[in-house]
Amino acid sequence: MTDLELQQLVATISMHDFHRPFQHRAYFNARLRTTGGRYQLASHDIDINPKMLTDFDEATLIGVIKHELCHYHLHLTKRGYRHRDADFKRLLAQVGGSRYAPAPKQATARPYRYIYECQRCGRRYYRKRRMDTRRYTCGRCQGPIKLV
């Protein structure tokens, strides 16, 4: 699904479920990591996490879109648009949006690039970042450390 198709889907859901037009931008934002979507108060745009489409089904995506549209329409009509507001909870239940987006699947942990070993006791240190072995010693025995 492209950003244009997402824009059309959001506009369709807005007219069908909220009976109001969506007049701003909706697009995928790959920088969203822990949330399904985001409504921006200043620009009124809606960002959607692309993982809601790739990792889950279309019903989940539509639930997230309805959630963000609740923020959008309530904010523009100057009513309670925050999660804790009764207006928000009422409208979300009325349109059948999702209260919570499912947690995106976590990427597999990157393997450690650097393995250091104490010359005296043999303890290993696994690091993602390089370190200056002349400045550091083993935390257990104070022996010198060497890159393996």
UniProtKB/Swiss-Prot annotation:
Residues bound to Zn(2+): 67, 71
Cellular compartments annotated: Cytoplasm
Cystine pairs: none
GO BP of this protein: response to stress
Top-level taxon of the source organism: Bacteria
Major location (coarse): cytoplasm
Cofactor note: Binds 1 zinc ion.
UniProt GO MF annotations: zinc ion binding
Pfam families, per database record: SprT-like (PF10263)
Segments forming domain SprT-like: 6-147
GO cellular component annotations of the record: cytoplasm
Keywords per UniProt: Cytoplasm, Metal-binding, Zinc
Keyword Hydrolase in annotation: no
Cofactor: Zn(2+)
Catalytic residue list: 68
Similarity section: Belongs to the SprT family.
Name of the protein in question: Protein SprT-like
Annotated source species: Lactiplantibacillus plantarum (strain ATCC BAA-793 / NCIMB 8826 / WCFS1)
